[in-house]
Structures are given as C-alpha cells and as structure tokens.
Amino acid sequence: MTRIKLSDNGISPFEKLIGHNKIVLEKWTELEIALFTGTKLDKNLLEQVRRTIAFENECEYCMVKAGKPNFDSNQKRINTATAFAQLFAIDHKLINDSHFDILREEFTEKEISELCSFISFITACQKLGRIYNLTEEFQINKTITMTELNKTKMQ
C-alpha cells in the first residue's frame, strides 16, 4: 500500500502519486520525455544508469522494471556513466573535479550536462517511489521479482 492515495490523474502508479497536482504531473512528464528523447546519449546507457541508481535508492518499483544493470564492463562509456551515477546516488557530496575529469575522457560537455541532469531527475523519481512505498506489485512492466533479485544477491 502506498503512503498516500493514488490520484485519478496519470497513467502509471508513479504518475498517479504525483498527479494530485495536474500541473506538476504535466511538467514532470514533459521533463521525463525531454531527458529520454532529447539526448544523443545511447538509450542503453541511460537504461543502465537508471538501473544502477534504482538499486542504490532501493526503489522496488524501479528495480523490478528491468532488474540489475546488465552490460559488458568493457563498454567504457556505460561503465563510466554507471560508476558516476552510483557515486551520485550514494553520496553526491563526494563528487569532485577529478570525477568530472574522468567523465571528460568519454563524454563531451553537452553529454555530461545531459547525463547529470538525467541522473538527478531519475534519482528524484526513485526517491519519491521509495518514500511513497511504491513497491513491486505496482510495476506492471516488471521483468523480475524482488524474491528473484534477493536470491541473486545471496549467490
């Protein structure tokens, strides 16, 4: 059960939670679309970043959507982006100039801006999902269960 009631506005359970204010829902959705479609960053890179952050933020709804990050560690751009995203999710105050130097080895300034904006937005979404208690049963697009994820954690 979520901590606040779902509104009548929005499509997904997440949207219904922020949909108590239609204007916020509308602008939130517009920003989400812009971040996913208005970028030259690879869609798989964005998805791996989203998955990485989901596990740090412990958002069940977000974790069961596609499971754990799944990429070849030789994919330097994805590896760099997910490492940065993980640090951001753990403690953004630890990020310093040297981390941006590492990002610059793989990304342009525009891409870094887009990546950081994406990470910030997704973090906000997932933290909201977590505090609202948006659990796995609300995720209609889940590909794995929390039970299965917990089993892989034990191995």
Give the positions of each predicted feature:
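Hydrophobic alpha-helical segments
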Residues: 1-155
